[in-house]
């Protein structure tokens, strides 16, 4: 199985996303893990400028990964899911929050 980290910054370019997904869709088994992109960057900025709590900032960055994953699912037939299984865009928040 391929585990693919899909950088959140890629959501700026829909054509690139479509090309990447065209290749991924040909794989037999994969798991896509989205990055947080600009959403996570904004959380980190607020962490620094607004003196946010570290745990709250960390959790918000995980939620940013979910947001990017949902946006990515718009460009492919691959479904976004909170369930850790093959051939999905993994939304990690529930898995990570439940493991704390």
Please place each PLM-identified region on the residue numbering.
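Nucleotide/pyrophosphate-binding catalytic subdomain
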Residues: 1-100
